[in-house]
Amino acid sequence: MSSRFPLYIIGIVLFASFFSCTDMVPTKEVRLIDSLNGKAYAYRYRSLDSSYKYANEAYRQVNFYKSGKAEASNNLGFCAFMAMDFDRAEALHKEVYKLTKNELELLIADIGLMKICQRTAMNKEFYDYRNSALKRMKRIREESDLFADRHEALRLDYAFTEFFIVSSIYYYYLQQRQEAITSLNRIPEDEALTDTNQLLYYHYIKGSASLVEATKPEDRKMREFDQLYITWRTAVQTNHPYFEGNGLQGLANLMVSPNNFELFRTRRGYALDQFGFPVDSLLPLRMAQRALEKFREYNDLYQIAGAYEIGRASCRERV
């Protein structure tokens, strides 16, 4: 009996090392799928093609790890959304409801569907998914100690930050500016700062949607500029062409007005020198052209159209 006991213990240890505690899924599979999904997320604002490749590989490689497949489906839904294939994006996010009972991935699916409804002006459905997301967030807060794994902790921070950013954008388009600012202010600063994707998104929305607070119109313009400049500079440093383009486009839009351009040339001349263009009346047009190059590199049809419009507006102002 005593000679068999150590063998019994060794057997348990080997079994535990082979299987994770996630629905008795092999540990090797969990690590592989989490790694692929992590790469899909890391590339989402760097290269949409690469993000899709890793998410699709994760989706196809799953045998038992259903919450990992749900995460891959959410990542694929993001890629479809950015490609403006809203029907496919909706189907992929809704597939998550069938794949898992993991509240975190279900929350991220709700938020993905909120984004689709906002973009396609489906207001009632937006609030349906938002209310569902709020209920899930409440349950997750009550059981936050369950998300101790580093991968899940990062997903948790992303989900909550994304919820408040998406809500803020929705309020902005409804011209409910104070509600939009309040939503952004609910993002814990440490959560936004730990995720470069969300940090860039946060600064970009604050600047492009003018969700900054100032008593004087001139000061408000300066704060918008500063948020967009931070977006551009950080995106260049971290190789995020999507936000590099958005930062440039937002700044070009601010400077389309000759009066605004003179204001920024006077008070932010040191920043304008960093773009590598002559600081003259054609600077907004050159910045819009560079933004267009970045959006083409990333293959973002929605922002490509916006860059063309800003370029045309800049030309009209100077005719």
PLM features: residue spans?
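Bacterial N-terminal signal peptides that target proteins for export
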Residues: 1-9
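Bacterial N-terminal signal peptides
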Residues: 9-17
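A "functional boundary" signal
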Residues: 21-318
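Short, intrinsically disordered/low-complexity patches at protein termini
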Residues: 5, 17, 267-269
